[in-house]
Structure formats: structure tokens, C-alpha cells
């Protein structure tokens, strides 16, 4: 598959020229991490000052809810950590790190979710989410939706409310958005799974 299989979704909010520039920086790596997979590497976007600026602008312009509707941004490990804090700082919000199990000091609360072959868990520090806190979840990619759903359950278990999701990329055909309980979401670009 070539770059032409990438569909510009909410990225169009920054204009055609900037959208095409950002897409041109997304690298397709066939056979990684295993044969039959095409890995979409957006690290070149982060390394390019213009690309990073476009990415952050696009994520903010494509927010699925108004900034007045959330108090914090929760970034999912690990690539949600790359742009989530910058978004939070620019919008005057706090940042919550949703980590893989065992990566945070005690006390934490966690949530498990199913993988194709087994289970995984995500955690937050117990004081990261206070009762009533409204949270926007951000990540680089929505595929099956398992991690985003687990993060939602975790934040809500802690007393918060997830108000929406912001993704850089969406893999179509895996029904990941179906696991988001109908909450508002946005993705900048879409591509086939």
C-alpha cells in the first residue's frame, strides 16, 4: 500500500497544503513488526518542526469537544505521551499518564483488557483523577479500541468522566470506534487495517 491509501480526515481543518505535507512525513514500513503488517511510523512528523507544528494545530482544531468541556488530557502509553502534554499545556489543562502496568510507583489503580493472545493492563496513579474530573483521551492510533476502552474504564473507576477521544490515525476495518461507547472522537487521518 502506498501513501495514497491514507485518507485525510479531520486533518483537513489545517488546509490542504499543510495536510498533504503532514501525510508526506508518515512513513509506511511493510513487514513490521511482523510479515503482513504495514506499520505507519509518524516519528518523522515529530522530528520535523513544521510537521510537529501542523500536527499539534490539527489535533487542537479537530478536538471532538470544546476545551471548556474537559479538565485534563490523558495520554496513552507511549505515543500519547509525545503530543498529549504539549496539547495540555497549550490548552491550559492537566496531563494524566495512562501507563502499562508496573511502570508507575504505588499507589495505582489498574484495568485489564484482552489482547489477541492474552491480556494487558493499564494504570494511573490513584490521585491522578479526582471525582468529577472531565478527561479527553489522546493517542496516536485507534485500531481495535482495546486500550482506549480500558483507559476509559480506568478513568471512570477513579471517579472521572471521559468526554471524548482524539487520535492521530484510525485503522478502518477493525471497529475500534465501536468500543468507545458512542463518545465523541476525532482522527486526523484514516487508513485500511
UniProtKB/Swiss-Prot annotation:
Family matches, as CDD domains: PRTases_typeI
GO cellular component: cytoplasm
Pfam family, one: Pribosyltran
Gene Ontology MF term list: adenine binding; adenine phosphoribosyltransferase activity; AMP binding
Subunit structure: Homodimer.
Family as reported in the entry's similarity comment: Belongs to the purine/pyrimidine phosphoribosyltransferase family.
Function: Catalyzes a salvage reaction resulting in the formation of AMP, that is energically less costly than de novo synthesis.
Name of the featured protein: Adenine phosphoribosyltransferase
Lineage of source species: Bacteria, Bacillati, Actinomycetota, Actinomycetes, Bifidobacteriales
Gene, per the UniProt record: apt
Amino acid at each position: 500500500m502506498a501513501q495514497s491509501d491514507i485518507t485525510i480526515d479531520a486533518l483537513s481543518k489545517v488546509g490542504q497544503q499543510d495536510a498533504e505535507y503532514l501525510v508526506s512525513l508518515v512513513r509506511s514500513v511493510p513487514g513490521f513488526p511482523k510479515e503482513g503488517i504495514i506499520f505507519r511510523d509518524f516519528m518523522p512528523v515529530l522530528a520535523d518542526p513544521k510537521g510537529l507544528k501542523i500536527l499539534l494545530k490539527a489535533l487542537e482544531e479537530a478536538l471532538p469537544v470544546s476545551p471548556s468541556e474537559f479538565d485534563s488530557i490523558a495520554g496513552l502509553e507511549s505515543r500519547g505521551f509525545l503530543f498529549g502534554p504539549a496539547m495540555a499545556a497549550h490548552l491550559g489543562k492537566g496531563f494524566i499518564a495512562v501507563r502499562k502496568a508496573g511502570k508507575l510507583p504505588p499507589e495505582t489503580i489498574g484495568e485489564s483488557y484482552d489482547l489477541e493472545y492474552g491480556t494487558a493492563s493499564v494504570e494511573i496513579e490513584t490521585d491522578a483523577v479526582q471525582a468529577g474530573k472531565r478527561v479527553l483521551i489522546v493517542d496516536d492510533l485507534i485500531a481495535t479500541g482495546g486500550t482506549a476502552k480500558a483507559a476509559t474504564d480506568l478513568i471512570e473507576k477513579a471517579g472521572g468522566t471521559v468526554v471524548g477521544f482524539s487520535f492521530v490515525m484510525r485503522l478502518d476495518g477493525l471497529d475500534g470506534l465501536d468500543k468507545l461507547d458512542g463518545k465523541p472522537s476525532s482522527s486526523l487521518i484514516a487508513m485500511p487495517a
